[in-house]
Every structure is written in C-alpha cells, then in structure tokens.
Amino acid sequence: MSKQTIVLLYGGRSAEREVSVLSAESVMRAINYDKFHVKTYFISQAGDFYKTQEFTVQPSESEKLMTNASLDASLKIKASDIYEDKAVVFPLLHGPMGEDGSIQGFLEILKMPYVGTNILSSSVAMDKITTKRVLESAGIPQVNYTVYIEGNDLEDCITETLETLSFPIFVKPANMGSSVGISKAESIEGLREAIALALKYDSRILIEQGVVAREIEVGLLGNTKVASTLPGEVIKDVAFYDYQAKYIDNKISMAIPATIDEGITSQMRYFAEQAFKAIGACGLSRCDFFLAEDGNLYLNELNTMPGFTQWSMYPLLWDNMGLSYSDLIEELVSLAEEMFQKRESHLI
C-alpha cells in the first residue's frame, strides 16, 4: 500500500517561529511511518519557502530541521511548489502569517487539505479583541477589558481603563500568542510602558483585568462534532507565565487532569465546546481558562494552533484521554481530509 504524504510547514514570519520549529521536530518523530511519508518545508523570517528534509522512516533524535540560522539558498522554492496531489498539509505555524487565516487561504487556493481551522475562524481567533466580542455574544464569561487602537487618543484609553479596571492589569497585542509582547502593569506609568511594548507587535491592544486565578486548559478536537478533554492545569514557578518561562526556562509544570470540582469541570468543557462552535472552528483548538479564587470561571483565550511538541499541553491532554500523540496526528489528518471534501462540495 502506498503511503500518504504529510507536508509539514514550519517556521514563519512571526515572533513565535522558534516554537514552530520545536512543534515540527516533535511531529516528524511521532508520525506513523507505516502509513505516512513526510515532507518538510521551512518558511523563513523573510517569508521565503525552502524545501527541507523528507522522511520515509522515523528520524533520529539528533535530526534537526532547517532554521533561519542554517538557511541553504539552493533549497529555496516558489511557495506553490509545496503542492502535491492527495497530500495533507500540517501547518505548524503560530501567530501572525501562520494561524491568522493567511496560510489557510493560500492552501485553499492550492486546493490542499490542511490540519486546523478555516480562514475565517483562524482570523477571528487570532485577534484577541474580535474573539472577545464573538464570545460575549455567545454568553461566555470573560474578564473585563478595554481596547486601545493605535491612532486613537491614548489618554482617553488610559482614563477609561482606570475607570473600568484595577491594578494589576495585563496588556496584550491583539494578534500574538505564546505570551509574546504581553506584560503586567501595576501603575499608571507601568500601563503606559506596557502599551508601548505591545505596540511593537500590533496596532490593536487588549487591556485586561488581572485576576488571581489558576490557569486551566481544555483540548478540543473535531469538525461539526467537537470533543473536549478533561482540563489540565498550568502550574507556574513564576508570577507571570511569559514566553521565557514557557519555552526557555522551563519554569512551569502541568497537572493532567487538573484537580477541579466535577461541576466546574463540566462547565469548563461546555464553555470550551461553545467557544469552538461560536467562532466556527474545526480540526483542533485549545481553550484556556482562569479559575479565580472566588470560584468564578473566565475564558481567557482560544488557540487554534496550540503548541504541538510532545511536552505541550494539547497533546498531553489527549494522551490523558487515551489518544496517543501519534494517533492524534492521524486523527487530525483525517479531519483535514473531511473538511477539504466538505469545502469542495460547497463550491456548487
């Protein structure tokens, strides 16, 4: 029986490109090579495409993918050269130009099935402000927030924020993930500095009420029918779970499943599934919650392409449900093919 090709797209132009490389290297080792043949393509920080390694058997732990530090100009290709009939693309790309609908639109033009959610849902979920407004309309609880758009009056925004929120306050670029560009403000001066930092990454800024809370995450999997995992908890050794703590210092651990009251667990899974449906997601997502000290539950973020290394929360949540890392990848490929056929059938 001939093997099906999985195309791994990794790298990208966003500040989250290093996370993408880690995810791709994990996936290429976990794939079932009895069924699949793997081709990898790197998108450089400049936005160019490079044809990198191919694998017909499981690569060794020492095998590393091309990065911006090891570019080989002779491997540069046209973006459309990734096309292969009947191949499925796994876009292991995070942040802008990766999970914001850009690459999804490109793959739909190429008529290639791809893992993950569609153009519109990717765009909505990538923008934290738009996500909040959609989830508000679905009745899903969230922390209070204000918004600053570059070009608007900053002083008016600060006045509104001080009237609406209390310190500590978190300031976030609307279109970044992995905690890139996010900072915590505990004073008016700190708020100004946090907004200035966030503006380096985006022109749309989300300003949120800080809460003392446990950080709980739920995995989602499916297309028109969605399944959710039992929650897992992020346990921090730092005050703020930022990019450095997540990916460099390893100052976090995870409790899977989280120790949570059964009623709250059910409520959390319900809200996660409703959020997935509200944005029209498909394939996979990870829903992140705050469980406050007073027992209130707030949906913090919906991530349509969560970190996908073997030690990332999303695969571990599914492993706890009895779905192994390798089988999860296979299920995502199947869901990608299902959605591709559905999209094609709608083009009447």
Swiss-Prot record:
Its catalytic activity? 2 D-alanine + ATP = D-alanyl-D-alanine + ADP + phosphate + H(+)
Query: Which SUPFAM superfamilies does the protein's record reference?
Result: Glutathione synthetase ATP-binding domain-like, PreATP-grasp domain
Q: Where in the cell is it found?
A: Cytoplasm
Question: A GO biological process this protein is involved in?
Answer: regulation of cell shape
Q: What superkingdom does the record give? A: Bacteria
Gene name, Swiss-Prot/TrEMBL: ddl
**What organism does the UniProt record list as the source?**
Streptococcus uberis (strain ATCC BAA-854 / 0140J)
One GO cellular component, as annotated: cytosol
Provide the protein name: D-alanine--D-alanine ligase
Entry cofactors: Mg(2+); Mn(2+)
Pathway of action: Cell wall biogenesis; peptidoglycan biosynthesis
Recite the UniProt keywords alphabetically.
ATP-binding, Cell shape, Cell wall biogenesis/degradation, Cytoplasm, Ligase, Magnesium, Manganese, Metal-binding, Nucleotide-binding, Peptidoglycan synthesis
Per its UniProt record, what PROSITE patterns does this chain match? ATP_GRASP, DALA_DALA_LIGASE_1, DALA_DALA_LIGASE_2
